[in-house]
Amino acid sequence: MTHAIEVRGLSKSFRADRKALDDVTLHIAPGEMVALLGASGSGKSTLLRHVAGFITGDAGAGEILVNGRHVQRNGRLARNVRKVRGEIGFVFQQFNLVGRLPVITNVLVGTLARVPKWRSLLRIFKADEVQGGLDALAQVGIDDYAFQRASTLSGGQQQRAAIARTLVQNASVILADEPIASLDPESSRRVMSLLRQINRTRKVAVLVSLHQVDVAMRYCPRVVALRHGKVVYDGPSAALTPGMLRDLYGTEADELLLDSVPDEDVSTAAMPAPAMVTMNLAAA
C-alpha cells in the first residue's frame, strides 16, 4: 500500500548537542486522521515542516515520501518537490493570511501551484477558480465574508479561511500545525470539527499537531506522541490514560493534561488490546 505520509529514520539537529528530531519513523495511511501530540519543544512543528518540505533533515539521515513520491532524502529536497507540495495543504498556527487582501484572494492562493507562472505572479484567477473559492468558503461557513479584508475576521474565521485554501488546492494531505493554539474553545471546536469533516468526506489524510490530550482523543483515532524529538507512543488515542502520559512525559504531562482529562487511570483490563501500539519508554 502507498502511504499518504511516510517518514523513515528522520533526524534533525539545529545544535550539535541536541537533536530536534531523533530517528523518527512513521506511516500514515490515505484517509487517516492522526494527532501529533507533545509538549512545547517536543519536535511537532519541526516534523510537520519537514514533511511539507520547508526544511531538510540532517545529511544522510532519513527520507520522507508523500503519496509514494519523495519530498526529501538524506538531507536534500527532491527535484520534483514543488509538484509534491501541491498535494500538501498546510494550516499554520497564525493562519498565514495577508490581512490587507480579501478573504477570497487568500483562499485562491491554494490554486497557484497548478496555474501558469505568469498568472501566479500576477494573481489572476479565472471565473471557475473564483467560484471554486467561494464554494470552499461556503463549506467552511464563511462565504459571507469572501470580499472583506482578511484582517477583519476573527481568529477562528481566519483559520477556517486557511482550511478553505487547502480545499481549493485539492490537497490529498493536510498538515495542521497547532491550528487551535490561539483560539477560544468554541472556535477550536469548529476548526477541529471541520478538519474531521474534511477527513471523513474527502478521505484526506490529516496530521494535526496538538498539545491537548482531550482534543486529540475526541477527534483523532490515532496518536503519535513525541518527546525530545523521539516517538514515544504510536497507537490508538483511546488507549492513552493520564497515568500512561505521566510514564511517558514525567512532569511535562501536566502541560498535556491541563486538567481537561480526569486525573485517574482508566482500567485497561476491560479495554480491547489496541491494534497497533508502539511505546518507547527508554526515549522518555
Swiss-Prot record:
Its EC number is 7.3.2.2. It is found in: Cell inner membrane. Residues 5-253 form the ABC transporter domain. The complex is composed of two ATP-binding proteins (PhnC), two transmembrane proteins (PhnE) and a solute-binding protein (PhnD). Keywords: ATP-binding, Cell inner membrane, Cell membrane, Membrane, Nucleotide-binding, Phosphonate transport, Translocase, Transport. The lineage of its organism: Bacteria, Pseudomonadati, Pseudomonadota, Betaproteobacteria, Burkholderiales. ATP binds at G38, A39, S40, G41, S42, G43, K44, S45. It comes from Cupriavidus necator (strain ATCC 17699 / DSM 428 / KCTC 22496 / NCIMB 10442 / H16 / Stanier 337) (Ralstonia eutropha). The keyword ATP-binding applies. GO terms for cellular component: plasma membrane. InterPro entries: AAA+_ATPase (IPR003593), ABC_transporter-like_ATP-bd (IPR003439), ABC_transporter-like_CS (IPR017871), ABC_transpr_PhnC (IPR012693), MetN_ABC_transporter-like (IPR050086), P-loop_NTPase (IPR027417). Belongs to the ABC transporter superfamily. Phosphonates importer (TC 3.A.1.9.1) family. It is a peripheral membrane protein. SMART domains: AAA (SM00382). Gene3D superfamilies: P-loop containing nucleotide triphosphate hydrolases. Part of the ABC transporter complex PhnCDE involved in phosphonates import. Responsible for energy coupling to the transport system. GO terms for molecular function: ABC-type phosphonate transporter activity; ATP binding; ATP hydrolysis activity. It is an enzyme of class 7 (translocase). It catalyses: phosphonate(out) + ATP + H2O = phosphonate(in) + ADP + phosphate + H(+). This is Phosphonates import ATP-binding protein PhnC 2.
